[in-house]
Design a protein with these regions (language model features):
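Short, well-ordered secondary-structure micro-motifs within conserved domains or adaptor modules
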Residues: 34-58
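A short, gly/pro- and small-residue-rich
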Residues: 54-71
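Catalytic phosphate-donor-binding core of small-molecule kinases
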Residues: 2-37, 69-150, 157-254
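Conserved acidic residues
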Residues: 40-42, 62, 149
Length: 254
């Protein structure tokens, strides 16, 4: 496809976004505007963490190209300097650019409200430093139970954030879901890398627990209420090819 035929959107409202829009025009592509009902693009540059999360939860027709995110994203200067290569990578292999499919999680609380997550899903006690008991049901191993302030389930995009701070590993695209206890009561509690589906529940009635999705509180969770977290969709994205290995953390791959 010729550059002039490409429909490219840049989502964001700061100076970085304007820089990218100028680069898209200079590269000869057609700059388009996306709305909640119109996402017909060949590529969408998303500027910043929040914008990228929203785009992944509400994917466009074409590939998402994250810019200015902590990981799995390009820097603004790199994206502008490699604009033609990024367009080329939409159709063929380009050195230093990887085309991936990123998992989007559906979070089913057993109520009519079904949520979507791009980065992570956490169950945490409503008040800080309050212990509850949680269980994790996996598809390929026995159920795990532990006492902690909470538990977080993260996609590769979110694995370097809250889950990593809680002791979970950073995983590359296609590496599965990270499951990490938050401030566990006992030492020696593992983090896990799971497949595409886990079920989390609260096993004690003492402390109120809230459901946090991509950093926002979405619901309260009652005792023994199963929260099903499952990959139900994958979104195409262009990201920088990894050049270094993440530092090792103890984990168990399922």
């Amino acid at each position: 496809m010729g550059e002039s035929q490409r429909r490219v959107a840049v989502v964001g409202d700061d100076d970085r976004s304007e820089t990218l829009r100028e680069a898209v025009r200079d590269a000869g592509a057609r700059l388009v505007t996306v709305t909640d009902t119109t996402t017909d693009t060949d590529a969408m540059f998303t500027v910043g963490e929040d914008v990228t999360r929203h785009a992944l939860r509400n994917p466009p027709a074409g590939a998402v190209i994250p810019v200015g995110t902590q990981r799995l994203g390009f820097g603004v200067e790199e994206a502008t300097n490699r604009m033609h290569q990024l367009f080329e990578a939409l159709d063929s292999s380009v050195e230093g650019i990887s085309r991936i499919t990123h998992p989007i999680l559906t979070v089913d609380t057993g109520t009519p409200s079904v949520h979507r997550a791009a980065a992570d899903v956490a169950l945490i006690t409503e008040k800080p430093a309050r212990i509850s008991e949680f269980s994790i049901r996996f598809t390929r191993r026995p159920t795990e139970s532990f006492r902690a302030d909470g538990v977080v389930v993260a996609t590769p995009f979110g694995s370097s954030e809250y889950a990593n701070a809680a002791g979970g590993p950073i995983v590359e695209p296609g590496g599965g879901l990270v499951v990490a206890p938050i401030a566990p009561f006992s030492t020696g509690i593992d983090a896990w890398v799971a497949a595409e589906h886990v079920t989390v529940s609260v096993e004690r009635e003492t402390e109120p627990v809230v459901l946090v999705i991509d950093g926002a509180i979405r619901d309260t969770v009652g005792p023994y209420q199963p929260i099903d977290i499952e990959t139900t969709e994958r979104v195409e994205a262009l990201v920088p090819t990894a050049t270094t290995e993440p530092r090792a953390r103890r984990s168990e791959t399922l």
